[in-house]
């Protein structure tokens, strides 16, 4: 038996996904700041909860301008539920790096989402600014879990939806 606390998400810590249009839902900026431990030059968020949703993906409390005052970076742990799709979008003027901790995911990308790349646990992924892409969990039973780092401290404000045949009504 482990002495470490159980940090698995419970139903009480999960949020509802964002409404159509992809806007994030979840904790307020004040709640995010309240979860941050400021050590005077080094800041920490301990045992972050899953509390925000965006475009079919759940995010643990991460670090961004909203809670640590970062200027150029944000970072989260993202969970793509079994069988879920994060509909096509682009990152405007910022880079994204991912490290897949668990699961298998497909990125369909390109102007018409005509290209694809499959990734699994242990893979690093780099997404250039402005590349249209859609994220698909390849399993109907297991989530994809990834560390996501962005060269944008605002997280979702500079993400734009693009057409997708999978998007409801789109």
PLM feature spans:
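A short beta-strand-loop-beta hairpin characteristic of the jelly-roll/cupin
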Residues: 85, 94-121
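A short hydrophobic beta-strand segment most commonly corresponding to one strand
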Residues: 75-78, 97, 126, 141-158
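Short strand-connecting beta-turns/loops that link adjacent beta-strands
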Residues: 67-68, 93, 112, 140-142
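Conserved short histidine dyad/triad with adjacent acidic residue
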Residues: 76-92
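Residue-level recognition of conserved beta-strand positions in structured domain cores
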Residues: 77, 90, 101, 109-111, ...
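A short, N-terminal "cap"/entry segment at the start of jelly-roll beta-barrel domains
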Residues: 2-72, 87, 157, 161-170
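Conserved metal-binding segment of the jelly-roll/cupin
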Residues: 80-83, 109, 119-138, 150-151
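Short, charged/polar surface micro-motifs in flexible loops or helix N-caps
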Residues: 67-71, 80-84, 102-106, 152-154
């Amino acid at each position: 038996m482990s002495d470490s606390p159980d940090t698995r998400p419970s139903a009480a810590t999960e949020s509802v996904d964002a409404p159509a249009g992809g806007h994030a839902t979840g904790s307020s900026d004040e709640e995010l700041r309240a979860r941050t431990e400021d050590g005077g030059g080094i800041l920490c968020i301990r045992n972050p909860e899953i509390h925000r949703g965006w475009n079919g993906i759940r995010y643990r409390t991460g670090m961004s301008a909203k809670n640590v005052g970062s200027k150029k970076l944000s970072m989260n742990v993202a969970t793509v539920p079994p069988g879920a799709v994060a509909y096509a979008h682009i990152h405007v003027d910022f880079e994204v790096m991912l490290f897949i901790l668990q699961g298998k995911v497909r990125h369909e990308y390109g102007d018409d989402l005509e290209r694809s790349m499959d990734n699994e646990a242990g893979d690093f992924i780099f997404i250039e600014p402005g590349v249209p892409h859609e994220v698909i969990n390849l399993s109907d039973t297991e989530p994809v879990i990834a560390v996501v780092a962005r060269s944008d401290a605002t997280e979702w404000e500079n993400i734009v939806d693009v057409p997708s045949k999978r998007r409801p009504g789109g």
